[in-house]
Amino acid sequence: MGRAVCLCSGGLDSTVAATIARRSGMDVYLIHVSYGQQAERREIEAIERIADAIGASDLMCSRIDLFRNISALTTQGARIPRGEEVSLDSESTPPTWVYCRNTVLLSMAAAYAEYLGAHSIYVGFNAEEAMSYPDNRPEFVEQFNALLEKAVASFSRPPKVVAPLVDMRKKDIVRLGADIKAPLELTWSCYLNGEIHCGTCESCQHRRRGFVEAGIPDPTEYQH
């Protein structure tokens, strides 16, 4: 089936996407990028366990400083909206938005894919987060794939971004992950760097609601 690069944060969505690629018979090459996110340590711990669990062929952990201190998400000690400050179904862009993050990270994944001769780049973009994050939307994927047609060497077959969850809400992703035996219990969703999920940041609230609405027991330990 060939090779697939999977851009994976160690979170729920990207782990399910990577598991889909692996279950389809592809050799999976995970790439994680540290860009200054407060939860960097916990993400790396999660992605290392996930790589082993799904049988990834390799895990590349990369680092860039471009995004440091330009978002609440990437400023150490910055206040991240929590609890009732979070509106899960809002269409407004939250302070955790990181400017052009997915454009940059996908470019890195595309370079890795071209080097490997991988024809697919799997991502965990989904309908729930697309409401407030424009670089999670189907039209973004479509336009980025059009860019890749022009961006690779003439002798290369352009890799294509594959977003298998792009029309799904979190509850659907949880159900699918359970069905394909993705290691959901190993994933890290929290924006913070604690020993357990805080339970109150936007990402924790999406995660918790997804398990509740899916009717599947949540393996996550939350602080609140």
Swiss-Prot record:
EC number: 6.3.4.20
Pathway: Purine metabolism; 7-cyano-7-deazaguanine biosynthesis
Any matching Pfam family: QueC
Cofactor or coenzyme needed: Zn(2+)
Cofactor comment text: Binds 1 zinc ion per subunit.
Keyword terms of this UniProt record: ATP-binding, Ligase, Metal-binding, Nucleotide-binding, Zinc
GO MF annotations, alphabetized: ATP binding; ligase activity, forming carbon-nitrogen bonds; zinc ion binding
Residue stretches spanning the membrane: none
UniProt xrefs under CDD domains: QueC-like
Name of the protein: 7-cyano-7-deazaguanine synthase
Species this protein is from: Methanothrix thermoacetophila (strain DSM 6194 / JCM 14653 / NBRC 101360 / PT) (Methanosaeta thermophila)
Taxonomic lineage: Archaea, Methanobacteriati, Methanobacteriota, Stenosarchaea group, Methanomicrobia
